[in-house]
Structure formats: C-alpha cells, structure tokens
C-alpha cells in the first residue's frame, strides 16, 4: 500500500524579498524547443538531526527561497508562448514561486529502493494545487521517522540541470546562513540571446532528429504496457570491471573508456536485450552534452538556461546485442566527440521556429546524468541528502549520486514489466 502525504499548510506563492525588474524576458531557441516542455523534478531526502524544530526549519526555508529569488527572479515569473508562436517568454512581475509543506508516513529508508510504481512518489511534489504552475515549486515533507523530503520542480524551458543545481546550492547556503547573497558565485546570467537562431540554412546530419521505422510496436509497448521502476547501484569495483570488459572487446589502440561511456553502453545493451526486439530495429541512445565550453566563445559563468544538446549513438538491435561492450562504449564516445561549436549551432537552428525538430521516440533510450550536478552537496542545515532521485521514475534513465561514495552511480529507469527480470539479469551479467 502506498504511503499517504497530507498538506499541513495552505500552499503559498513566495515572491522575491527585494524589488526585481518588471519585464518580459525571451527564452532562447534551445529553451523554447518542444522537447523541453516538461519539468525537472528532484527528490532530496535528509536524515534530520534529532530535535529539529519544524516551524523554525520551514520558516528558514521560506525566507531563503525569497532571498534566492532576487537574483533568480525569472523563476518567480510565468512562462507564456509568444503571440507569433515562435518561442517562449517569461513574464516577470514577481508573481512568486510555489511553496508547500506536508507530512507523510514514509520513512527515509523507503527511498533506498525503487518506487513500486512510476508515480508512487508523485505526492511529494503536489504542483497541481496551483492553478498556474510556477517555474519553481518547492515542497517540504516531514517523514514519520523525523527525516525530511524536499521535492523541487523546475520548468525545464527556463533552467537546465547545471543551472538548477547552482540555484539549489545558493538556496541552501542562504537557508543555513553560511553565505551572503552578495558573496555567492557564480552570479546568475540570463543572456539567452547567445543560443538563438542565426538563420543558418546549411545544416549537417543530426541522427537524434531522424525518424526510424517502428518494426516492433515499440511506441505501443512503452505507452500501453505498465512500466516498472528499477534501481541498481554500480560501485567503483563494478565500474572498473565494465571498463576491463569494454577494453577486451574493443578495437586495438583504443584509449581507456570513461565510467560514463561503459556504464551507458552496458545499460543500453542490457535494456535492448531485455526487450526482445527484432534484429533490424534501429535503436538510439540519447544523452545530454553540456555545451557551455564547447561553443565559441564559451558561455559566461552563471548561465543557467538550457546549454546542452543531445548526443546520439545509433545502431541496430543485432549489432548492439551481439557485439561486445567495447562496441557500445565506442558508439557513446563517438557521439560525444561529434559535438563542437558547429554541431551545437546546427542543433540551435534545427530546433528553432519554423523547423522545430524534435527527437523521435521509436527505439530511443534517454540517459540524464544527475550524478555530476552537485545535488548531493545541497545542505539546508540538515546535513547532505542521504538520497537523491526523481519524483517520478519513468522511461528516462537517470544516473544518480550515491551518498559518501563519489565514484559510485545509482541507475534508475522504468522498463516494461514483461522485461524487468531479463533487464536485471543482463545488468548483473555483463559477461553473458
């Protein structure tokens, strides 16, 4: 039986504590792309110190939120479509970010496992209580064992993963009083014009936007069959073993693989094998690549808009499942190496109006690497989080940090229920 969550205070909108500009800000072409019209939703679980005063903690969080919204005032605005439908804007009138407080009979240990269903933890961020959902919603939930869950939702079109982590660390520092607003670095930078269309017409080939035939009823299966969340932790020893396997099955002369390359390849290969797809079905692995320092000139420090493009590894089911891990890791490496300034600028043009290219869903697995964002360092005075994860575990595959083990990675993804046992078998049997 799912645990209950109950609001204990009326939801409020928290405005910036100081006056902020009343203006309309344009989001970039990358921000406005159709692919990003969804929220980033984090779940941070804290082992609250004994005797913590709930009222004092909640008040401190609320005050820190109001202060952090001064430099990040667009998060207190509202997103709207431009009149000509060419993109999105943020109307900034200090409307406020959402703040909720709740209690639950969950305990911190409940979050050590995968959720029982994709939406089991949905009530830990009750965004639907707001008639118009703000770009930022925060929910503080007191657990039955005295621990605390912090749900945070960001409008992805306003901010990306790196930007959201920078905001959360500022928010937390202000809550503890460890830093003053004037001292915090990097200062948030808007400058969304830096990733706008320049009207280029000569664009290269971008497989992430290409369509492939659905030979297996892939879309139907992922939309109609129940998805079951999974959670598996890879420690340093396991990752080293994957690197050795990859090197033993790669072309002579390859440089050692990174943990991301081998883990992504292993997850992708295990996922594909578990689904029993036709040999000729084309599969794609998509993953975000930070372009802050890949574009020329580099984006300014503190740029918190969407500054990533999708790397795309593509192959057939036959090659992915029959060739070794080294082959998979090579595909991931090649996808990373293709991304430079020219590639990124072409993506900006591709997703801009009127082209509005968007990734296909046929044969696609998407990986998002939260393990390197610094979410495990977000301390509101309750210590560092004991668990970092998503509000909802769906078909997006997430790489998550592991407490007190910087070289370990927790992998969460939901797969069709009929494939769960096979997926977990192949994950744990890299030599098979």
UniProtKB/Swiss-Prot annotation:
GO terms of molecular function: acyltransferase activity
Induction: Induced by ethylene in ripe fruits.
Enzyme Commission number: 2.3.1.268
Tissue expression: Expressed in fruit.
Biological processes per GO annotation: alcohol metabolic process; fruit ripening, climacteric; response to ethylene
Reactions catalysed, as given in the entry: 2-(methylsulfanyl)acetyl-CoA + butan-1-ol = butyl 2-(methylsulfanyl)acetate + CoA; ethanol + acetyl-CoA = ethyl acetate + CoA; butan-1-ol + acetyl-CoA = butyl acetate + CoA; butan-1-ol + propanoyl-CoA = butyl propanoate + CoA
Disulfide feature: none
Record-annotated active site: 156, 379
Pfam families listed in its UniProt record: Transferase
Keywords for this protein: Acyltransferase, Transferase
Coiled coil: none
Similarity comment: family membership: Belongs to the plant acyltransferase family.
Role this protein plays: Involved in the biosynthesis of volatile esters which confer kiwifruit flavor. Alcohol acyl transferase that can use a wide range of alcohols as substrate to produce esters. Exhibits acetyl-CoA:alcohol O-acyltransferase activity.
Protein name in UniProt: Alcohol acyltransferase 9
């Amino acid at each position: 039986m799912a645990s209950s969550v109950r609001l204990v205070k009326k939801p409020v909108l928290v405005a910036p504590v100081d006056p902020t500009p009343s203006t309309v800000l344009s989001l970039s072409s990358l921000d406005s792309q159709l692919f990003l019209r969804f929220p980033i939703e984090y779940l941070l679980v804290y082992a609250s110190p004994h005797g913590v005063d709930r009222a004092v903690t909640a008040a401190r969080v609320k005050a820190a939120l109001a202060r952090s919204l001064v430099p990040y005032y667009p998060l207190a605005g509202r997103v709207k479509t431009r009149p000509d439908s060419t993109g999105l804007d943020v109307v900034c009138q200090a409307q406020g970010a959402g703040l909720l407080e709740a209690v639950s009979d969950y305990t911190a240990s409940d979050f050590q496992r995968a959720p029982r269903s994709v939406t089991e933890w949905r009530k830990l961020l009750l965004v639907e209580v707001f008639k118009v959902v703000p770009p930022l919603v925060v929910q503080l939930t007191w657990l039955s064992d005295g621990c605390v869950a912090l749900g945070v939702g960001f409008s992805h079109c306003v901010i990306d993963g790196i930007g959201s982590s920078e905001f959360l660390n500022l928010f937390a520092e202000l809550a503890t009083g460890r830093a003053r607003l004037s001292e915090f670095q990097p200062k948030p930078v808007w400058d969304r014009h830096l990733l706008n269309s320049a009207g280029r017409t000569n664009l290269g080939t971008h497989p992430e936007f290409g369509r492939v035939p659905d030979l297996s009823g892939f879309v139907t299966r992922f939309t109609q069959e129940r998805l079951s969340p999974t959670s598996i932790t890879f420690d340093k020893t396991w990752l080293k073993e994957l690197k050795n396997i990859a090197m033993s099955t790669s072309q002579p002369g390859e440089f050692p693989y990174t943990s991301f390359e081998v883990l992504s390849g292993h997850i992708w290969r295990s996922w594909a094998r578990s689904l029993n797809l036709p040999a000729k079905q084309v599969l794609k692995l998509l993953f975000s690549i930070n372009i802050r320092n890949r574009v020329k000139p580099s984006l300014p420090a503190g740029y918190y808009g969407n500054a990533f493009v999708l790397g795309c590894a593509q192959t057939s089911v036959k090659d992915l499942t029959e060739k070794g891990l080294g082959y998979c890791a090579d595909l991931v490496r090649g996808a990373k190496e293709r991304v430079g300034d020219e590639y990124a600028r072409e993506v900006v043009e591709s997703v801009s109006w009127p082209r509005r290219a968007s990734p296909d869903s046929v044969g696609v697995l998407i990986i998002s690497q939260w393990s390197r964002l610094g979410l495990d360092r977000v301390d509101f005075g309750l210590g560092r989080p004991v668990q970092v994860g998503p509000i909802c575990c769906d078909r997006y595959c997430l790489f998550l940090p592991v407490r007190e083990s910087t070289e370990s990675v927790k992998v969460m993804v939901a797969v069709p229920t009929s494939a769960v046992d096979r997926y977990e078998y192949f994950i744990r049997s890299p030599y098979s």
